[in-house]
A protein has these predicted regions:
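Generic C-terminus detector
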Residues: 95-100, 399-401, 405-439
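ATP/NTP phosphate-donor binding region
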Residues: 1-180, 187, 191
């Protein structure tokens, strides 16, 4: 056996008697069934529970696993699906030993360690997206129940409500924060963390994301990099497993106000679509496509000044791009749009900046200027769903550490993390590895 044995004792899958030994390694549980060796990958396991004798079934140990299973007749995407394993363990002490051995191994702790359950504060925004966040959480609640953790649930009903709740959390009472909502709710939660006197500690509280909004760009990014398909149950699975990574935030300065962004800034066509399509929110993500087609028929341009400090590793590929490292570069022109991203995915179906990473210390910026035809623009919008648009001739791509945008057109919309902000000069500067997420 390749892996070191962590624990070994009698164990049998029900209804067989516990005559053979089960073997636990750091990542696999082995047992015998009808003389054939069976195994369970602990990477799929979320928790265990002890079961007393009932209705003639002997006492034992129940293990909850969520392996990937292909679902759907057409897409056949892989989704986490519950599978339960009931093992016969008549001895009370042995049952508890098996449970502790498995639970401790799941969190990479010694068998004799006294492990306290992780404590999660779950925030649900029932007004996000199609207003189904509460129902979405109920679909995945059982996964939290089956895991070795404790949680409390609070519904919020406005941006201020979310900020105030997070601002007043007692950090010593929780180990993580879970958001069931859209990107706007995540923005509000981060604002609440950063408004605290102890923000330097608070912002390190790991964030778990369950998609309940329209776009869900951060959640899609986390699922994609973890090789999980886009589904609430898969997002909940990542949270329960508890793996963490750092991710960048950006400080935003505008009109003597300072706050933080985790996702994006858009201006021009993109922000017009994002905000103008709000009245079609009931259509979900389809609203963006329909409204974009409407605006393409009467395409606007926006005069402005885009200044930026390039990332040291950035190598320009566009013929219009000339870079002097370490200095502010300035582009003043008529723009169709500017789209700055901290994540690869702006929404679950829009891979806008496929080279972006959550903790690369930079933002990826896409620019299209006046002179781009409607056909070329439509092509860019259609291809960005799969991230196949960066080689288009009129699309400029930049990787930056900081940037300033000064709109020089009177009327327009600026959007940060999916929410409109003042239409005035704005500056964003990346702060590497400031926050943490479950991934």
């Amino acid at each position: 056996m390749e892996n070191h044995i962590v624990y070994q004792h009698k164990l049998a899958i029900y209804p067989e008697p516990a005559q053979e030994s089960g073997i636990l390694t750091k990542d696999t549980l082995f047992w015998q069934h009808n003389g054939v060796k069976q195994q369970l990958n602990l990477n799929d396991v979320v928790g265990t529970s002890l079961v007393e004798q009932e209705d003639g079934i002997p006492p034992g140990l129940l293990i909850y696993a969520y392996p990937k299973v292909k679902v759907g007749l057409i897409t056949k995407k892989q989704q986490r699906v519950l599978q339960q394993y009931y093992f016969t363990v008549p001895d009370v002490k042995l049952r508890s030993q098996w449970q502790q051995a498995i639970n401790n191994t799941l969190v990479n702790q010694p068998l004799d360690a006294d492990i306290k359950p992780r404590r999660l504060q779950i925030i649900i925004n029932p007004t996000s997206g199609k207003k189904k966040a509460s129902q979405i959480f109920e679909q995945v609640r059982s996964l939290f129940e089956q895991s070795n953790l404790e949680y409390s649930v609070t519904e919020t009903h406005s941006a201020a409500d979310t900020k105030n709740l997070v601002h007043n959390l007692i950090l010593s009472d929780i180990d993580g924060l879970v958001i069931v909502g859209g990107d706007g709710t995540i923005h509000d939660a981060i604002a609440g963390l950063m408004s605290r006197p102890d923000y330097e500690t608070a912002i390190k509280l790991p964030l778990g994301i369950i998609p309940g909004g329209t776009g869900n760009g951060l959640c899609k990014t986390l699922l994609e990099q973890s090789q999980e398909s886009y589904a609430p149950i898969n997002a909940a699975f990542l949270i329960v497993k508890g793996k963490q990574q750092s991710f960048d935030l950006a400080t935003v300065k505008q009109n003597n106000r300072e706050y933080h962004s985790f996702l994006s800034l858009s201006w021009g066509l993109i922000s017009d679509v994002d905000i103008g399509s709000e009245k079609l929110k009931f259509l979900g993500a389809l609203r963006f496509d329909l409204y974009a087609l409407l605006l393409l028929s009467a395409l606007r341009t926006y005069k402005g000044k885009f200044s930026f400090i390039p990332d040291p590793d950035f190598k320009p590929t566009h013929h219009r791009t000339t870079i002097q490292q370490g200095e502010w570069q300035v582009i003043e022109d008529d723009f169709i749009f500017l789209w700055a991203m901290n994540t690869p995915w702006a929404a679950h179906d829009m891979n806008v900046t496929p080279h972006a990473q959550l903790n690369d210390g930079a933002m990826d910026v896409l620019v299209m200027r006046k002179g781009t035809s409607r056909l070329e623009l439509l092509q860019a919008l259609l291809r960005c769903g799969k991230g196949q648009h960066l080689d288009l001739p009129h699309l400029e791509y930049y990787k930056v550490r900081a940037f300033r945008l000064e709109p020089l057109t009177d009327k327009g919309i600026l959007v940060v993390d999916g929410e409109p902000v003042d239409y005035s000069a704005i500056e964003m500067r990346v702060i590497p590895d400031l926050a943490y997420v479950n991934c």
